[in-house]
């Protein structure tokens, strides 16, 4: 028979929401996201530091390249720092993991996903353009981002103050 610990003795958890930006534009499935998080934590914190924070990938959002990572309470700042410091991945090339926020519940962590800008893809010839709702554009060739820019739509004359 399995003995349950009282709620006072069980570990407390925090949930870190993050988004992966990489040089190679590809959607990461759950396994790829898990491998990336493990490589990031091990490269920055080492095996003992990674074990201390007790990471567990709870959710992966393939369409957003985002995820929710469960860590021990009190260790969330170490996890945030380790994810943010990871810069080069053997499979994805240059990578940036943007930490969107931390929460005490999964539902609260999912609210941070609304901060990710929506995007659409357009193909012109051999180039692909990734258009974001906030006015940014990425130029993609052969699966790699080769240029990025942002633009502002000028206001019509009657709307200028």
UniProtKB/Swiss-Prot annotation:
Catalyzed reactions: Endonucleolytic cleavage of RNA, removing 5'-extranucleotides from tRNA precursor
Localisation per UniProt entry: Cytoplasm
MF-aspect GO terms: ribonuclease P activity
Keyword terms: Cytoplasm, Endonuclease, Hydrolase, Nuclease, tRNA processing
Cellular component terms (Gene Ontology): cytoplasm; ribonuclease P complex
Protein's GO biological process: tRNA 5'-leader removal
Family that this chain belongs to: Belongs to the eukaryotic/archaeal RNase P protein component 2 family.
Protein name: Ribonuclease P protein component 2
Gene for this chain: rnp2
